[in-house]
């Protein structure tokens, strides 16, 4: 199992090219199941979760390959299996997105109950209830979600009980091939939903309202091929902005979209950063200063993203002052805090709230990554701490950050990957 060794007290500065968004690429890859013709996707990041998804698609009978330019080519015209097995699904919660397009196009699907990050309860209930309202018969048997429908799904009005990105995407995908009109109320509004809707519309779907809490889909009989470029990763962008903010540095994030990060940019400016934006870049300059503490409350988009909470927790641990962080989206999402405390941070956790007391300096030690975003906060902490930090279980990071050590090195970080066998 790989680890990172990080030598600290680096000021992180320079330019970084932002990858395509994992959280858009994954649903779009699964949505390609709906197409009867080949699909070409560009700006798809090279990540563990992407490779897992491609393997699931191949298991179903999709021809899925990358060409010499890195584009992903998909042909789902000859799908002949309708089961996503446990051995592939177990590592990734997003694999539940195979269910809706299979049921919508082939009227049957079996998807193993998924795995992934250990961030509290992320039930698939909302996916299931949405598909049931469209007419699917669903049972849970032997660890599998089994769905079928005798004919096409039928459009209806669906009010999602709790705002859910995953369920919004599942219902929207299924509705593209349903008879009649489907209206999703209380839909999630994330940019990745907009990107998925744009992709589906290029294939011939009739979706309006994506990006609002009211999405309308007119069902069509079939979807065709298209080309699509994945939207830039707003969470990777925010992570590199934090890297400069906590180290007194200056970073230019290229190939990104500032309008997907308004809540994050507002908080960075509140923390004392100078932030300038163009159509496809964001520049953050801390001018060598220590950040000021900022209160954070996570919320569905356009609120503050839960996937940036761990990075801002780190910022607050080295900032001037005391801050309160409230996590409203997921339970059990403060697992990075005990590790940061081991590095000299000061914080108390009570329920879904953490109170951080900024310290001037963290100290390197050995820490364990527990989930994707917690992991990257520990790596960034190592970049600014004194001495050496070892980050274990970095497979979490490989699930969501493309070429992370190369990008950090380009900004001046002293970081290397090694395995336990190297230590022997």
Swiss-Prot record:
Catalytic activity: phosphoenolpyruvate + UDP-N-acetyl-alpha-D-glucosamine = UDP-N-acetyl-3-O-(1-carboxyvinyl)-alpha-D-glucosamine + phosphate
Keywords: Cell cycle, Cell division, Cell shape, Cell wall biogenesis/degradation, Cytoplasm, Peptidoglycan synthesis, Pyruvate, Transferase
Name of the top EC class for this enzyme: transferase
GO biological process, one term: peptidoglycan biosynthetic process
Top-level taxon of origin: Bacteria
Pathway the protein takes part in: Cell wall biogenesis; peptidoglycan biosynthesis
Localization of this protein: Cytoplasm
Gene3D superfamilies: Enolpyruvate transferase domain
Enzyme Commission identifier(s): 2.5.1.7
GO cellular component, one term: cytoplasm
UniProt-annotated binding residues for phosphoenolpyruvate: 22-23
Function: Cell wall formation. Adds enolpyruvyl to UDP-N-acetylglucosamine.
Family (UniProt): Belongs to the EPSP synthase family. MurA subfamily.
Record's protein name: UDP-N-acetylglucosamine 1-carboxyvinyltransferase
């Amino acid at each position: 199992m790989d680890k990172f060794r990080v030598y600290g007290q680096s000021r992180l500065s320079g330019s970084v090219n932002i990858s395509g968004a994992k959280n858009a690429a994954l649903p779009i890859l699964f949505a390609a199941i709906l197409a009867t013709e080949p699909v070409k996707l560009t700006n798809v990041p090279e990540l563990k979760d992407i490779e897992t998804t491609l393997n699931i698609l191949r298991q179903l009978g999709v021809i899925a390959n990358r060409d010499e330019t890195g584009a992903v080519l998909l042909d789902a015209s000859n799908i002949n299996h309708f089961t996503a097995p446990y051995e592939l699904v177990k590592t990734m919660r997003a694999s539940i997105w195979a269910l809706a397009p299979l049921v919508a196009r082939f009227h049957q699907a079996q998807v193993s109950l998924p795995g992934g990050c250990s961030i509290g309860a992320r039930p698939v209930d909302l996916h299931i209830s949405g598909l049931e309202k469209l007419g699917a018969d669903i049972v849970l048997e032997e660890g599998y979600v089994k769905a079928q429908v005798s004919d096409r799904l039928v459009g209806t009005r669906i009010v999602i009980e709790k705002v859910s990105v995953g369920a919004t995407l599942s219902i929207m995908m299924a509705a593209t091939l349903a008879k009649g009109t489907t209206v999703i109320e209380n839909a999630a509004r994330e940019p990745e939903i907009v990107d998925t809707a744009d992709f589906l519309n290029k294939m011939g779907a009739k979706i309006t309202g994506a990006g609002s809490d009211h999405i309308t889909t007119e069902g069509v009989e079939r979807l065709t091929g298209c080309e699509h470029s994945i939207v830039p990763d707003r969470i990777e962008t925010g992570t590199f902005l934090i890297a400069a903010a906590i180290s007194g540095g200056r970073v230019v994030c290229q190939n990104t979209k500032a309008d997907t990060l308004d809540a994050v940019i507002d908080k960075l400016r509140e923390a004392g950063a100078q932030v300038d934006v163009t159509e496809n870049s964001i520049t953050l300059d801390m001018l060598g200063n220590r950040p000021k503490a900022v209160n954070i409350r996570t919320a569905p988009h356009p609120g503050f993203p839960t996937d940036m909470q761990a990075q801002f927790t780190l910022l607050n641990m080295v900032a001037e002052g005391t801050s309160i962080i409230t996590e409203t989206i997921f339970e059990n999402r403060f697992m990075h805090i005990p590790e940061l405390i081991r590095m000299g941070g000061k914080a108390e956790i009570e329920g879904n709230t953490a109170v951080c007391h900024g310290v001037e300096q963290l100290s390197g030690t050995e820490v364990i990554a527990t989930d994707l975003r917690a992991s990257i906060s520990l790596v960034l902490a190592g970049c600014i701490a004194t001495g050496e930090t070892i980050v274990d279980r970095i497979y979490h990071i490989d699930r969501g950050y493309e070429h992370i050590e190369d990008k950090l090195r380009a900004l001046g970080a002293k970081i290397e990957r090694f395995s336990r066998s190297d230590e022997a």
